[in-house]
């Protein structure tokens, strides 16, 4: 994470501009006086630098606030270098080298955001793999079917970086990578947008079955996003997981599925190679979709009504069925005219962390609006109620 540590620094006069960067204000934490935020704007993007006075070490650590992450990371490093220079920081250590920033200014075209597919997905267009790991199966399918477009979903950063490197080295152009929870991602896709959906060797969670990706809610979203003739393919070495998934399918009112055991797939993963050597059984469960699904009504309004009082916010947390909302930290600008509220909300599996920016009677989400999932919208309405 880009940062520097300083023995001392002095806030410059705000606002100030340098090399296209606007440092517009600093804000103090209302409950923790040893923490501050600095608001930065550049190229239509905005983010916070966070300053923490570490009393035990008798120094200051200045980094970007990861809740306001922007890409590429070179933008953040340059902002920190400018701030260090303008604040006359006495730097003790840093990881802000120019060489790294130049290399990190380049964005890979293969890494996409979930929002991208809300507008780009079309019926029967995508083959999707959830949890692609080393990418062996995903890349094999992409090379075998160059006419298809693939989405690989993964939350393990080293796996993502490895596959991104291979996509560039092997010049594979029909794959997009998304670092996001698959259960929430499917909710964002248009109906009938997937032709094949692969879930190969998911973590079985034998002692915590509630953490499995297969659930009634997941199956409902899978069926909705599969086009007519689309297939959901589960491949697992866990008999318990296989039986669990089969029972979920049988609970559906109408379903067509098939089963295979120890079927030789065109390509095997490193996990499958390991299980084969141990003479373990491999189970395939294939759900065949034969129904067209209408597009759901997706929440789109994440605006706030005019506020009566800027100081109405307070720390609080509320848990509802399937979602939650919380206000975690409160910050106020030096002139008292603006506030930043750090909030966490939405689905328990993949919560959003967002700042609310309040100036006068106006409130908005800092940086960008939340992902338009149902859980996020329900939480948004509760946040709006708290601030009214």
Curated annotation (Swiss-Prot):
S-adenosyl-L-methionine binds at residues 129, 154, 181. It catalyses: guanosine(46) in tRNA + S-adenosyl-L-methionine = N(7)-methylguanosine(46) in tRNA + S-adenosyl-L-homocysteine. Pfam families: Methyltransf_4. Pathway: tRNA modification; N(7)-methylguanine-tRNA biosynthesis. It is an enzyme of class 2 (transferase). One of its GO terms (molecular function) is tRNA (guanine(46)-N7)-methyltransferase activity. SUPFAM superfamilies: S-adenosyl-L-methionine-dependent methyltransferases. InterPro entries: SAM-dependent_MTases_sf, tRNA_(Gua-N-7)_MeTrfase_Trmb, tRNA_methyltr_TrmB_bact. The keyword Methyltransferase applies. Keywords: Methyltransferase, S-adenosyl-L-methionine, Transferase, tRNA processing. CDD domains: AdoMet_MTases. GO terms for cellular component: tRNA methyltransferase complex. Its EC number is 2.1.1.33. Substrate binds at residues 207, 237. Catalyzes the formation of N(7)-methylguanine at position 46 (m7G46) in tRNA. PANTHER family: 3-DEOXY-D-MANNO-OCTULOSONIC-ACID TRANSFERASE/TRNA GUANINE-N 7 - -METHYLTRANSFERASE, PENTACOTRIPEPTIDE-REPEAT REGION OF PRORP DOMAIN-CONTAINING PROTEIN. Belongs to the class I-like SAM-binding methyltransferase superfamily. TrmB family. This is tRNA (guanine-N(7)-)-methyltransferase. It comes from Wolinella succinogenes (strain ATCC 29543 / DSM 1740 / CCUG 13145 / JCM 31913 / LMG 7466 / NCTC 11488 / FDC 602W). The gene is trmB.
